[in-house]
Amino acid sequence: MAVVTLKQLLEAGVHFGHQTRRWNPKMKPFIYAERNGIYIIDLQKTYEQLEAAYSFVRDASKEGKTVLFVGTKRQAQEPIREEAERAGMPYVNQRWIGGFLTNFRTIRTRIKKYKELLALREQGYIESLDYKEQKRVMRELEKLDKYYSGVKDMDTLPDILFVVDTKKEEAAIREAKKIGIPVVAMIDTNCDPDLVDYPIPANDDAVRAIKLITSKIADAILEGREGRQGIVSSEGQQASMEEIAEELEAIDETEKYLDLIDEEKEEE
């Protein structure tokens, strides 16, 4: 049984790469063709790479390991939060804080401070302060909430990073590699697959594509921890890229930009 079908990948727009002038040659093995100025990702390769990543994450989850979800670009913020929360995992969906992994001792003190302020607010203590002090504390709490709400229960370094857009999250990946944390990531045609341990070739700009891939990583965690399988029917999984090629013939460059992305594709 498959964790996803080629039809699902196609319908989510996972196959849309970047314009041909914006590509990384290392992505060539994952590219099926060029259509009207954009590269088309080979969904068979996406299928295979996602299966490998799914198995890796599922097995890690069986051992009680933690996956940190990372995606700070506009299109990724909600899928990252929703799927990480569904899987009971920490997440970063705002700005990546430098040293989050490599200087986690300091980060942990900030998380502790954040939790202390949350407790004080819950107890009504902040409301008892004078107006000026109350405003100062609330500003501090709002700032901490923005950057640390997704990791407030994370007491130790994560075992795995799941990342959307390796170019955007270059700092996070660099820190993970420095301390030996394996990385699973969605990689578009402008990315370097060699930077991650489990690359998943996919359109990392469309909300639907991000949601689909991220949900499968969450499914893998739940299956590993609870035996809750996130598999789908095997119907359609044997379809090849050649068999769905006719779906790609009429592709227009604007489809990646307008049909599948809520707002115009972010420039590098």
From Swiss-Prot:
InterPro entries: Ribosomal_uS2, Ribosomal_uS2_bac/mit/plastid, Ribosomal_uS2_CS, Ribosomal_uS2_flav_dom_sf. GO terms for biological process: translation. GO terms for molecular function: structural constituent of ribosome. SUPFAM superfamilies: Ribosomal protein S2. PROSITE patterns: RIBOSOMAL_S2_1, RIBOSOMAL_S2_2. CDD domains: RPS2 (cd01425). Keywords: Ribonucleoprotein, Ribosomal protein. GO terms for cellular component: cytosolic small ribosomal subunit. The keyword Acetylation does not apply. The keyword Cell cycle does not apply. It holds the Pfam family Ribosomal_S2. HAMAP family: Ribosomal_uS2_B. Belongs to the universal ribosomal protein uS2 family. This is Small ribosomal subunit protein uS2. It comes from Coprothermobacter proteolyticus (strain ATCC 35245 / DSM 5265 / OCM 4 / BT). The lineage of its organism: Bacteria, Pseudomonadati, Coprothermobacterota, Coprothermobacteria, Coprothermobacterales. The gene is rpsB.
